[in-house]
Swiss-Prot record:
Protein name per UniProt: Aspartate--tRNA(Asp/Asn) ligase
Ranges annotated as spanning the membrane: none
Highest taxon above the source species: Bacteria
Positions with a binding annotation for L-aspartate: 176, 222, 451, 492
Locations listed in the record: Cytoplasm
Gene: aspS
Originating species: Ehrlichia ruminantium (strain Welgevonden)
Record-linked Pfam families: GAD, tRNA-synt_2, tRNA_anti-codon
SUPFAM superfamilies: Class II aaRS and biotin synthetases (SSF55681), GAD domain-like (SSF55261), Nucleic acid-binding proteins (SSF50249)
UniProt xrefs under InterPro entries: Aa-tRNA-synt_II, aa-tRNA-synth_II, aa-tRNA-synth_II/BPL/LPL, Asp-tRNA-ligase_1, Asp-tRNA-ligase_1_N, Asp/Asn-tRNA-synth_IIb, AspRS_core, GAD-like_sf
GO cellular component terms, A-Z: cytoplasm
Binding site for ATP: 222-224, 485, 537-540
EC number of the protein: 6.1.1.23
């Protein structure tokens, strides 16, 4: 028999009345009623109310002085609660345990975090004492949710015939967009392993090895700055790769997995069909490659309406190659001037010169700084294109296309929030497809890959040889939910001649490609199947399901905003003997 407990703290019911039981757990709450002290005993599973009375002075004195969160084992008799004290919010709310003996397993010191309180604490306190923070229901439930989500994902993948395979953690550096975490080799002096940013090359090699459907709950490591939806250092993804598939095959596999997870673990509605939006349209209509479709506002291009107009600022910008984007603001025409001024100031904080705007007071009256420069036909066209009705306003931004998209997107987001337009209690998924294959690096004055260098260009070798590189699209795709990118994927480039050509456009010689990716190029010489994959982020999925604003809320032991583990004290200095063993020397920054 277990000496610590006969039952868990969520188990006891009326059918256990008059039984002698043993329970163990943490002292969650104490209520001193003079001659009686009530204690809520908590374990992982729930809470049971204990009753201590002063008839046994030794036990009573112990519990009187014992601090909250001390760990105890008790024996006692289960009794029914008085009807007036039944707690229907607890599974055990109809009973209590009259304590006859107690053993203090470990006594707690004064708590830096009140476990039973909803009080907010600083992130430094929470992460330094994460073992206490994890005792709080909200944080604990997030971690339990994460476990359940991963279990359900594994079931889904196995049911579809996928094989779970672990890939190496110590590998070589790869050019996947972020900085690597490097591990010095003790044996091979001057050489380093890299922690994988993703299992990209390994999962492709698995396809070349003849495996048909691979998945892994994969740890990934990227030396990136923190954001609300990105934890520095380490994250996990559902890594997937399949042979003999097209882009549509990937969509058909992963959509049901996402729908199942979000339906099973949330009461929010979910769109059962994921619309497909090209990267071009996402940037044009939403000002972001991560469009939040809960926001009904749609940006429109009104460059041609302002071309050759009397509004000289925009007309001059257009002649210099700039564009004009319009962001509708419903039911704001009668808002005070301060409303419009605040949006102009907001745009300036982003780096824009400002915003123009027109208020459509009624069907025949338009006001604002720009309205007087536009004739009726131009105003009517704005109303038509932007779906404007009487009482609405429109904001305008004029910049080069990339900046115009950014500024318009931020204004769209701000208006959606301020005007309470964001649809609540729903998950709005979409695919973003047709990403550019290359981009121009203005700083380096060179062409580089836009995203994944291992993806297949649309049009294959012919496109690489005959098209402007900046016009070539890739078989790359993202899943976006509520404005958060939760997955990226691609159909891979499995043909060496296409790979060499693509890398040559980005400035790599054949010899450089063979040296950098020797395993992949060697493998592709022995029969590589067409293959593709995707990798939804576990942390972001759980963050959305838990409805928390920060990804660190769903990670058990996260790094802080500065990439520090305050609990374990890392990163930390290494002693000189260890450095010498690794042939390393620390150069102090001046």
């Amino acid at each position: 028999m277990n000496v610590y407990r006969t039952h868990l703290c969520n188990e006891l019911r009326e059918e256990h009345i008059d039984q002698t039981v043993t329970l163990s757990g943490w002292v969650y709450r104490k209520r001193d009623h003079g001659k009686i002290i009530f204690v809520d005993l908590r374990d992982h599973y729930g809470i049971t109310q204990l009753v201590f009375n002063d008839s046994d002075t030794t036990i009573f004195q112990l519990i009187t002085t014992l601090r909250l969160e001390s760990v105890i084992t008790i024996k006692g008799i289960v009794k029914a609660r008085d009807s007036s004290t039944i707690n229907e919010t607890l599974d055990t709310g109809s009973i209590e345990v009259i304590v006859s003996s107690i053993n203090i397993e470990t006594a707690s010191e004064i708590l830096p975090i009140n476990i039973a309180s909803m009080q907010d604490y600083s992130e430094d306190i929470r992460l330094t004492y994460r073992f206490l923070d994890l005792r709080r229901d909200k944080v604990k439930n997030n971690i339990i949710l994460r476990s359940k989500v991963i279990t359900e994902i594994r079931k889904s993948m196995e049911n579809m015939g996928f094989i779970e395979i672990q890939t190496p953690i110590l590998t070589s550096s790869s050019p996947e967009g972020a900085r690597d975490y490097l591990v010095p080799s003790r044996i091979h002096h001057g050489k380093f392993y890299a922690l994988p940013q993703a299992p990209q090359l390994f999962k492709q090699l698995l396809m070349v090895s003849g495996f048909d459907k691979y998945f892994q709950i994969a740890p990934c490591f990227r030396d990136e700055d923190a954001r609300a939806d990105r934890s520095p250092g380490e994250f996990y993804q559902l890594d997937i790769e399949m042979s003999f598939v097209t882009q549509e095959d990937i969509f058909n596999i992963i959509e049901p997995v996402m729908i199942n997870i979000f339906s099973k673990f949330s009461n929010k509605t979910i769109n059962k069909e994921f619309p497909k939006i090209s990267y071009h349209d996402a940037m044009l209509y939403y000002g972001s490659d991560k469009p939040d479709l809960r926001n009904p506002l749609v940006i429109q291009d009104v460059t041609e309406i302002f071309r050759d107009s009397e509004f000289k600022i925009f007309n001059s910008n257009i002649k210099q190659g700039m564009v004009v984007r319009a962001i509708p603001a419903p039911n704001t025409a009668h808002n005070p001037r301060s409303f419009f001024d605040s949006k102009i100031e907001f745009a300036k904080t982003l780096g824009a010169q400002g915003l123009g705007y027109i208020t459509f007071i009624d069907d025949s009256l338009a006001k604002g700084p720009i309205a007087k420069f536009l004739d009726k036909d131009r105003l009517d066209n704005i109303k038509l294109i932007c779906n404007i009705k009487a009482g609405d306003s429109v904001f305008f931004v004029s910049e080069i296309a990339d900046k115009a998209a950014l500024f318009a997107g931020e204004v769209r987001t701000l208006l959606g929030k301020e005007l309470n337009l964001i649809e609540e209690n729903t998950f709005k998924f979409c695919w973003v497809i047709d990403f550019p294959y290359f981009k121009y690096d203005h700083k380096e004055k060179s062409i580089n890959f836009f995203h994944n260098p291992f993806s297949m260009p649309q049009g294959g070798l012919e496109a690489l040889e005959n098209q402007d590189p900046l016009n070539i699209l890739a078989y790359q795709y993202d899943i976006v939910c509520n404005g958060i990118e939760i997955s990226s994927g691609a159909i891979r480039n499995h043909k060496l001649n296409i790979m060499y050509k693509a890398f040559s456009i980005a400035g790599y010689t054949k010899e450089m490609v063979d040296e950098k990716f020797k395993a992949l190029t060697r493998a592709f010489k022995f029969g590589a199947p067409p293959h593709g994959g995707i990798a939804p982020g576990i942390d972001r999925i759980v963050m959305l399901l838990a409805d928390v604003p920060n990804i660190r809320e769903v990670i058990c032991f996260p790094l802080n905003q500065s990439g520090e583990d305050l609990l374990m004290g890392s990163p930390s200095e290494i002693d000189n003997d260890h450095l010498k063993l690794l042939s390393l020397n620390i150069i102090k920054k001046t």
